[in-house]
């Protein structure tokens, strides 16, 4: 029994470089699901005057957006099946901490790092 692996990667970048892994394989070649973050080569967005290399990676913001969209769609699918997933509330809003404490109490045996 295995797990399904998902990669968020920059396909333009990976197409322009050789693998540094001893297997000579790249991430997208060993994962079941591959999501292209559509970044530029070298994952950089700006070339400032006097610089030899570009700076300002886009993969961080795009990757976070992709992951958050996956979470949103997953919650939508669960709700459509009548399942209300335990989602933490922002602790910075009134009542947020109390709301989260209920979840902590309910799932305390499964949340070992808290």
Task: Describe the function of each predicted region.
Residues 76-114:
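Active-site phosphate/pyrophosphate-binding segments
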Residues 32-33, 62-69, 102-114:
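Short, Lys/Arg-enriched charge-dense amphipathic segments
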Residues 1-65, 71:
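Glycine-rich phosphate-binding loops that contact phosphosugars or nucleotide phosphates
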